[in-house]
């Protein structure tokens, strides 16, 4: 399994491949995206792509993880935030998804492709866990048990 690159040029190449994959999702759909198409769109050879990703699903997993991480970074982790801050966060979340290469298609892909659903679900579990930990630490709702708070956060 290829590791994440550390050098600037390698990081830029990996990002270029992810951007190309996102753009192709919007152009041709997840079924028709191939590693050869992504390599061509990114202006690299297929062996270069395979230096960074084992296969199509490793590439699409990384693409989904990149978007999930960026979205999660926008979520205010202070459970005491007022509604205006939360509403702005949601609008920023939507805008980030729109501006990301293939963003809306990445979200659809994470729901439609069984091999990729875990990317979205693990991201949600991680973020839910962080929100619950902060809420419990602040005693947002004294006396409420952890399982109940996790369910409410997950459904929100």
What does each of the following model-derived ranges do?
Residues 18, 87, 91, 125-136:
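An amphipathic alpha-helix signature
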Residues 16, 58, 85-92, 151-155:
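Amphipathic alpha-helical interaction segments
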Residues 60-67, 120-123:
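Alpha-helical DNA-contacting segments of helix-turn-helix folds
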Residues 92, 96-97, 128-129, 143-156:
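Hydrophobic alpha-helical segments that form the core
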Residues 1-12, 143-146:
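N-terminal intrinsically disordered/low-complexity leader segments
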Residues 62, 75-100:
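Hydrophobic alpha-helical connector segments
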Residues 99-129:
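Short secondary-structure transition hinges
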Residues 12, 16, 20, 24-58:
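Helix-turn-helix
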């Amino acid at each position: 399994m290829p590791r994440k690159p550390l050098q600037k040029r390698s990081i830029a190449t990996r990002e270029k491949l992810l951007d190309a994959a996102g753009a192709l999702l919007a152009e041709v759909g997840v079924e028709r995206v191939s590693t050869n198409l992504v390599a061509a769109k990114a202006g690299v050879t297929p062996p270069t792509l395979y230096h960074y990703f084992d296969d199509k699903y490793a590439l699409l997993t990384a693409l989904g993880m990149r978007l999930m991480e960026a979205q999660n970074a926008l979520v205010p982790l202070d459970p005491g935030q007022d509604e205006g801050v939360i509403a702005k966060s949601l609008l920023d979340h939507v805008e980030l998804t729109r501006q990301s290469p293939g963003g809306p298609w990445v979200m659809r892909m994470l729901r439609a492709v069984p091999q990729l659903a875990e990317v979205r679900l693990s991201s949600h579990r991680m973020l839910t866990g962080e929100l619950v930990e902060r809420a419990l630490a602040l005693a947002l709702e004294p006396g409420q048990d952890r399982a109940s708070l996790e369910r409410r956060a997950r459904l929100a």
